[in-house]
Amino acid sequence: MGVRITPENRQPVHISNSFRMQATSAETNVISISAGLGLKTKVLTTFVKGSPIAQFIKNDLGRRGIDYEGKEVEQGGPWGYRHQFNIADSGFGLRAPRVCNDRAGEVGRTLNIKDFDLDRIFGQDGAQVLHLSGLVAALSHETGVFCLELARAAKKYGTKISFDLNYRASFWKGREAELSAIFSEIASVADVLIGNEEDFQLALGIKGPEAGGKDIASKIESFKAMIMEAKKRYPNVEVFTTTLREVVSANEHLWGAISLDGDKWTVVEPRTIRVIDRIGGGDAFVGGLLYGKVKGWDAEKCVHFGWACGAFVATLLDDFGLPADEEQIFGIWEGNARVRR
C-alpha cells in the first residue's frame, strides 16, 4: 500500500503548492465498497516499521472498517524501504489527468507468502472471496509468487478468487515470460476475471478491440468476442467482465460495462457520468460486483450495482468509495439525484 498526493482544486502538479493525501491501493479501493456496506474485509500487506506513513495508512484503513495483516519491515536507513507515492492530479476540462508513480524502495515488493498463515486465513477464518490485482502480482518476483500461492491456497479451501489483470507495461518490461506464466495460472483458477481490452491482450495474449478511442459503444461486439476467446482459454472462470470508458473530457465520461456470467450476458451501454476524479472508478465497479456476488444477487443486478459504484466513486476526491447504503448506489443506477430528506 501507499499514498496518493493530489493538488487541491484540480490544479496540475507542477504548479501546485497545496496538496491532499490519502491512503490508496487497487485492492483496498475494491474492498472499500463491501467494508462501507458492513461486510468484513481484510487486506494482506506489509508496512515499514515505525513509519508515520505506515501509521497514516493503518488509521485510514481503520476509518473505512478494513482490517489489515502484514509484516513490519525495518526501514534500513534513509535510502531503505518506504511506502509508494502516487502523485496525481484530477485534470479539468480538456486538460487530462497526469499520474506519476514513485515506487523506489517500495516495501510492498517484499510481500512473502511465508509471512502469512494461509490455513488460518482460508480455513479457520473462512475467507469467502480472495481479490488479487495484477499490479501486485507484477511488482516483483516475490509478489508474483505471493499472489500465485494465495490463489492456490484459496482454491484448496473453496474460496472464490477474483483477479483484476491491471496490466502495466513498465512492470512487465524484461519479465514478459515470467509474468505471462504467473498471470495465466492465476487466471486458470480464478472464478471472476476482470480486465479492459488492453489487459486481456497484453497480459493474456487474447486479441481484442483497439484500446481507447472514440465511439466505444460500436465496439461492444468486439469486446464480446474477446471475452468468448478468454472463456475458451479459461473454461473454469465463472464471470468475465470489462468496463467501457470513453473520455469526453476530464469532467465527463461515457461509462459502461460488459459481463459474461456463465452463459448470461449483461451489457450496460455507455452512459454519461460526471467526474470529479476518475481514479478508482474501475476498482469500485469490481467492488460493487463482488459485493453483489457475496450477497447472492443475480448476474444483472451485480453488474448494475458495480456500474453504479464506479459512477459513485467518480464523484469523489478519494480513490475509493464508502456508500451510505445500497439505496444510494441503486439511486445512481436509476439516475435519481433528487434530494433525500
Question: Predicted segments — roles?
Answer:
Residues 1-13:
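Positively charged, low-complexity intrinsically disordered leader regions
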Residues 10-30:
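Short catalytic helix/loop segments, enriched in acidic residues and glycine
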Residues 22, 29-42, 63, 292-295:
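Alpha-helix C-terminal capping segments
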Residues 40-134, 329-341:
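Conserved N-terminal subdomain of the carbohydrate kinase-like
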Residues 116, 144-149, 175-184:
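Charged helix-capping and loop-helix junction motifs
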Residues 155-160, 234-238:
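A short helix->loop->beta-strand "cap" motif at the edges of active sites that frequently abuts
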Residues 171-263:
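Conserved phosphate/ATP/ADP-binding segment of small-molecule kinases
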Residues 250, 265-335, 339:
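Conserved post-catalytic alpha-helical subdomain immediately downstream of the catalytic base
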